[in-house]
């Protein structure tokens, strides 16, 4: 499919950005808990604190992305600069206050990133191109993250230095800044309208369908955070057969998870293009439900636990690959072009809320003991039926014409 070259450049930039993130994402909880001695709950709170500043970043980033005086590009540059500063603090963490400051800054930087990044893809594509374009962006995320996790595991094995991972992450943000500065023009100038800061938000908050969607979106993002932050500690500390889950194996497992997401990201577009956005999200929920059951099985199995875990991350990767372009495409259909930044800000606020809920929830469950840790995955699997019910309600609202989607 022929796309604007800037879409490809953005995908390449995201690959680089996620390569740096992969160095830290799965190893940060292990570093802070097992080497610095913080409890899982304390680390969960610190990681979750990024969501507080992330809410501020998304709120401002969405509005500024829709402002002719700011635009998408300037907000992306601000995001990269703040995120690089965050890694300076995280690389130098020895006490809990520094850990909190680093995570608050990282949350702010990432908060600024998502609204303009997603809005740019929408600006540069047609409706027929968007599922593929959003999938391509997520493919860049997955490939970069996968290589980052893999090389991070090798780097830890060779050097034993977790702090070096944060240094490399900071360098990736600097390179990303250079790419955006030199190779990307501001895509939103043709569609942006002059309006006060609050006018755009006033129009957006009246979209009832958007708020219904946000409920299920928070569920999805909480699921993702359980895979990213809770699962490494669960397999490390609670698996019935801990020999199957060494640090090297966990590194390989999560590299496979991201590799699976990359492999299936573009092929899954052929499936979701035949479905409505609601149907695509229901399909994702079903995959998540199966994946959580397999995680429970892997944690409780005395034999073949690692093989079951591979199957679990395969299914959860397909769930993620199904969710990402479908959710972004649904937001584009809801949003007027001049308000895409704000709509994507609200969409990405769901990630902030998921980040706020997910790590502390997972940390609390793991602190509560083995039985709670094991059963948590079964409760997570059962929760998908609540999400599917909400999606049926949303579909009925659309079918009844209570609110229309601008195609």
Residue ranges and their predicted role:
Residues 171-189, 390-395:
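C-terminal membrane-cytosol helix-exit motif in multi-pass small-molecule transporters
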Residues 57-92:
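Conserved MFS/SLC helix-loop-helix module at the cytosolic interface between two early adjacent transmembrane helices
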């Amino acid at each position: 499919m022929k796309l604007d070259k800037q879409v490809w450049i953005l995908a390449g930039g995201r690959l680089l950005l996620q390569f740096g993130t992969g160095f830290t994402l799965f190893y940060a909880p292990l570093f802070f808990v097992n080497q610095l001695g913080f409890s899982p709950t304390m680390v969960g709170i610190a990681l979750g604190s990024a969501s507080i500043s992330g809410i501020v970043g998304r709120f401002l980033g969405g509005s500024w992305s829709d402002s002719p005086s700011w635009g998408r590009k300037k907000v992306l540059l601000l995001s990269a600069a703040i995120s690089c500063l965050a890694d300076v603090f995280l690389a130098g963490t020895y006490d809990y206050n520094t850990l909190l400051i680093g995570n608050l800054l990282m949350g702010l930087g990432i908060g600024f990133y998502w609204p303009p990044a997603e809005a740019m893809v929408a600006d540069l594509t047609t409706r027929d191109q968007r599922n593929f374009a959003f999938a391509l962006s997520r493919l860049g995320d997955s490939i970069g993250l996968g290589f980052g996790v893999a090389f991070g595991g090798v780097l830890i094995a060779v050097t034993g230095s977790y702090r070096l991972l944060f240094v490399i992450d900071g360098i990736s943000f600097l390179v990303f800044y250079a790419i955006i500065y030199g190779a990307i023009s501001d895509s939103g100038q043709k569609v942006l309208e002059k309006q006060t800061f609050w006018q755009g938000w006033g129009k957006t908050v009246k979209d009832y369908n958007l708020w219904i969607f946000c409920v299920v979106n928070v569920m999805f993002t909480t699921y993702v955070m359980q895979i990213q932050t809770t699962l490494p500690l669960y397999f490390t500390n609670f698996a019935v057969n801990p020999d199957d889950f060494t640090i090297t194996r966990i590194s390989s497992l999560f590299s496979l998870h991201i590799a699976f997401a990359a492999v299936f990201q573009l092929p899954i577009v052929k499936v979701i293009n035949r479905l409505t956005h609601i149907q695509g999200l229901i399909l994702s929920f079903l995959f998540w439900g199966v994946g959580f059951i397999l995680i429970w099985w892997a944690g409780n199995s005395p034999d073949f636990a690692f093989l079951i875990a591979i199957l679990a991350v395969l299914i959860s990767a397909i769930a993620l690959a199904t969710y990402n372009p479908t959710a972004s495409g649904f937001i584009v259909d809801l949003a007027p072009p001049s308000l895409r930044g704000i709509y994507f800000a609200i969409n990405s606020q769901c990630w902030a809320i998921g980040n706020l809920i997910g790590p502390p929830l997972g940390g609390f469950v793991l602190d509560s003991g083995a039985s709670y840790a094991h059963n948590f995955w079964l409760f997570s699997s059962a929760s998908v039926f609540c999400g599917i019910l909400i999606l049926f309600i949303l579909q009925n609202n659309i079918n009844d014409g209570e609110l229309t989607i601008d195609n």
